[in-house]
């Protein structure tokens, strides 16, 4: 946990799914992961990311040039009854992923597995801020330089139909 100016104490997990992610429960922020809150979710996500990078050192065990949290994944209860959780991933200079984020889903699967909340070959469905979903599973556990890691499989497809009522 860290202290973030204007937000207070924030609890989070750091996980790797291609980049380092900070995973933050939206409930502690008093927010919902919803497209109507996108601007505020981005603002808060960047504050959290920047404070983490000022106070916590992360380094990939095989690639020391990967040494910062690049993305903040804010997760929430799903609105889709088939999904397990819902998220928005904030990155860059204020962008967010409209999909559940492939690398973010990997990071979430690794965190859930490490906490004993999902087992080998159990399906996990992640809903995005726009309502799209990704499915993933932990296939096996491995070691990466003596650090527990997972191998996962993910399958997904997208259907987009633009309309004035959908962001």
Language-model segments: residues:
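Active-site proximal loop and beta-alpha junction motif in alpha/beta enzyme cores
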Residues: 1-167
């Amino acid at each position: 946990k860290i202290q973030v100016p204007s937000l207070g104490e924030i609890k989070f997990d750091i996980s790797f799914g291609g980049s380092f992610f900070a995973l933050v429960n939206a409930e502690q922020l008093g927010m919902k992961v919803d497209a109507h809150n996108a601007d505020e979710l981005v603002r808060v996500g960047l504050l959290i990311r920047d404070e983490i990078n000022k106070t916590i050192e992360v380094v990939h065990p095989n690639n020391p040039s990967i040494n910062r949290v690049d993305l903040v994944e804010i997760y929430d209860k799903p609105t889709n009854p088939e999904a397990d959780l819902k998220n928005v991933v904030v990155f860059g200079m204020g962008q967010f992923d409209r999909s559940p984020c492939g690398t973010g889903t990997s990071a979430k699967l690794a965190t859930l597995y490490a906490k004993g909340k999902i087992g080998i070959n159990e399906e996990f469905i992640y809903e995005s801020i726009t309502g799209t979903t990704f499915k993933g599973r932990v296939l096996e556990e491995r070691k990466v330089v003596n650090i527990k890691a997972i191998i996962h499989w993910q399958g997904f497809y997208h259907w987009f139909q633009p309309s004035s009522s959908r962001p």
